[in-house]
């Protein structure tokens, strides 16, 4: 052990398992292992738990900076929320929604389908039906194994939509649900197969486009409280904050992962602790794997695969007002506009709060452009966009905040990782393959619940089950 490798780790401890990352996946893995009688150390680089779920008070307003919504199919998360004694509440959705058409005209409507014109609606329904068919045929568990996987993974979602419809408004509107709303990448940057996985993880594409389904409920006190409650149960002798992991080493010089013998000691070096264990669960997104030195190095396939997984980019905008003024106008606060700066807006008022909160989203290339502007200009343009949906009152919030996970050292994007064109069918089957004593767990690798807290919890539980020797869970449980 050299001075360089220890990196200032002055305290050495022994545990059965080290978990890297104290987000929902890592904490669920730790919780499952501790319940089975294993000793665990959870090492978290940040000064908080929760990963990409994060709540904080800004100028007196409680804001959910990260992930926040629960849909009815997210049974793993719903069961845990109940078990932890937490409560949920429905997103406000009474009144009319607003659709901003490509020509800039404003339309109010009720129901789930935009008032985009009869012919465009017909085309949108056709595209949704085609995607629902692919979802039913391919599923979320092993999309790369489908006979048409290569074909569907080597054409962009943008071009596939336009192969099946010549209605540009229909293509743009359907594209927004996956591109802007989920993967936060331009529709030309990911494949149809990746879009199908995203939809299959929610049960169907119809579910994905139904905001009353996919954005159904929130946790009272914020989604981060799920992780905070799990961490509090585990205790400070299990969860270590401000502890970025630098090196994971299990063999002497010349060792290979192919030679790994279960139970071989693993040493994990961090800035604060050196931990000796038998197994490791890496519970951070794939774009951060390269922040860790692995000794021996990861296999070639892993090195290549991780370079084809990246996070998107989105600005989550929070605007707080003295009252939810849009409700007085008979509006729900929900708005969509594929060509608008903020492509979506929702009523995000907190439980029991007399003030009103709007949340809007500016994704991918639009976010790039805005981040090149001074903060005040960015704020002006975003609020102007919100006003197009809900009126001039939106220009004057009492609190304004932009979530920017792209600049976070230990996140570097939002919402989650996806493959570039051709990557999913090429590498998907290998993304959870254990490497020696190391297992992987995060929402980015999930089937059901992909990119969501529910998927993170499923992955954490699955990794723990593998460590415990329980074998793989069934595809339906993943």
UniProtKB/Swiss-Prot annotation:
Superkingdom assignment: Bacteria
Enzyme Commission (EC) number: 1.4.3.10
Gene: puo
Naturally occurring in which organism (per UniProt): Kocuria rosea
Catalysed reactions listed for this entry: putrescine + O2 + H2O = 4-aminobutanal + H2O2 + NH4(+)
Annotated positions binding FAD: 15-70
Cofactors that this protein relies on: FAD
The organism's taxonomic lineage, starting at the top: Bacteria, Bacillati, Actinomycetota, Actinomycetes, Micrococcales
Gene3D superfamilies: FAD/NAD(P)-binding domain (3.50.50.60)
Protein name: Putrescine oxidase
GO molecular function, one term: putrescine oxidase activity
Annotated family: Belongs to the flavin monoamine oxidase family.
Keyword Flavoprotein: yes
Flavoprotein found in the keyword field: yes
Keywords recorded for this protein, A-Z: FAD, Flavoprotein, Oxidoreductase
